[in-house]
Regions:
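C-terminal alpha-helical cap of glycosyltransferases
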Residues: 117-133
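Catalytic binding pocket for nucleotide-activated donors in carbohydrate/polymer assembly enzymes
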Residues: 4-10, 40-113
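Donor nucleotide-activated moiety binding/catalytic core segment of transferases
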Residues: 1-43
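Short secondary-structure boundary segments
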Residues: 1-4, 106, 119-122
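Short N-terminal micro-motifs specific to bacterial/archaeal maturation
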Residues: 18, 36, 78-79, 116
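Soluble or luminal CAZymes and related metallo-dependent hydrolases
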Residues: 23, 80, 117, 121
């Protein structure tokens, strides 16, 4: 892999987004794929059924420290785990070539974690809170 082949990749942090007044979800909507850590944003991105990869460089530290919200986080992370620069370049190359080995698993997990996909979740949340429209 040559670094110049990936010159169009931009790495951003939450602080950068906030400082520039950007909306993460608008960016996600126009993204072909997502590379993330343990943030729950991938559950939202999964609704678009696009490739997701996960960085796992501090897995043990995170597990032993803050911990995960689910017992088996790897079950829900339907995408490759990036541990090396080669893994990163491989994922980007696969996305660029339209290859998606994780689509079936992602669809299965999406059905579990995003049960309602009818755009009425706000209405349901208000009803649970005792607010009727």
């Amino acid at each position: 892999y040559k670094e110049e082949d990936f010159s169009n990749i931009v790495i951003q942090s939450s602080d950068n987004f906030n400082a520039m007044g950007l909306d993460l979800y608008r960016l996600l909507a126009s993204s072909d794929a997502l590379i993330t850590d343990y943030s729950s944003v991938f559950y939202d991105f999964m609704l678009m059924n696009r490739p997701i990869a996960f960085t796992v460089d501090d897995y043990e530290e995170y597990k032993d420290g803050r911990g995960f919200a689910v017992e088996d986080p790897d079950y829900y992370r339907a995408g490759p785990k990036i541990q090396t620069i080669e893994d990163l370049f491989s994922f980007i190359t696969q996305v660029s070539n339209g290859k998606d080995e994780w689509q079936e698993k992602r669809e299965k997990v999406n059905l579990e974690v995003n049960y309602y996909r009818d755009f009425k979740n706000c209405k349901r949340a208000l009803k649970i809170g005792g607010v009727e429209l």
